[in-house]
């Protein structure tokens, strides 16, 4: 059984970034699914102004999350491809921009549990990918 799981994991070239991207991709799929079932977790992210979160906006957020999880999944397996690498990196840049602008400009988020996770994941991933590009891209 362990051999099967090892056979489907991405090639890492000795690094950990592909595993991280795969993990974040899978977690994002679950986050996306929950936005279609209940808007309460989405309201936690935008907790400074949760009345702006509607079922439609939550589903749109979930769809956006699903699209980025697919890109990140491909990124986990094809980091040696410059275009895939950069596209994956852009998903984190856009996520960081979105959450920072919602917090600092639009005022729908506040620094707390709901915002900390997305901010940490997007910013750490973005910096990690910036620093490791030459290691992975052929």
From Swiss-Prot:
What are the alphabetically sorted keywords of the record?
A: Endoplasmic reticulum, Glycoprotein, Lipid biosynthesis, Lipid metabolism, Membrane, Steroid biosynthesis, Steroid metabolism, Sterol biosynthesis, Sterol metabolism, Transmembrane, Transmembrane helix
Which residues are noted as glycosylation sites? 40
Report the membrane topology from the UniProt record: Multi-pass membrane protein
List the Pfam families.
Erg28 (PF03694)
- Any one annotated GO CC term: endoplasmic reticulum membrane
Give the UniProt family note.
Belongs to the ERG28 family.
Family annotation (InterPro entries): Erg28
Instruction: Output the superkingdom of the source species.
Output: Eukaryota
What is the protein's name according to its record?
Answer: Ergosterol biosynthetic protein 28
Swiss-Prot/TrEMBL GO biological process terms: sterol biosynthetic process
What molecular functions are annotated in GO for this chain?
A: protein-macromolecule adaptor activity
Function, as annotated, reads: Part of the third module of ergosterol biosynthesis pathway that includes the late steps of the pathway. The third module or late pathway involves the ergosterol synthesis itself through consecutive reactions that mainly occur in the endoplasmic reticulum (ER) membrane. Firstly, the squalene synthase ERG9 catalyzes the condensation of 2 farnesyl pyrophosphate moieties to form squalene, which is the precursor of all steroids.
Q: Which PANTHER family match?
A: ERGOSTEROL BIOSYNTHETIC PROTEIN 28 HOMOLOG (PTHR15451:SF19), ERGOSTEROL BIOSYNTHETIC PROTEIN 28-RELATED (PTHR15451)
Kindly list the residue ranges recorded as spanning the membrane. Answer: 17-33, 56-75, 87-107, 114-131
Species of origin reads: Candida albicans (strain SC5314 / ATCC MYA-2876) (Yeast)
Subcellular localization is given as: Endoplasmic reticulum membrane
Q: How does it assemble?
A: Heterotetramer of ERG25, ERG26, ERG27 and ERG28. ERG28 acts as a scaffold to tether ERG27 and other 4,4-demethylation-related enzymes, forming a demethylation enzyme complex, in the endoplasmic reticulum. Interacts with ERG25, ERG26 and ERG27. Also interacts with ERG1, ERG3, ERG5, ERG6 and ERG11.
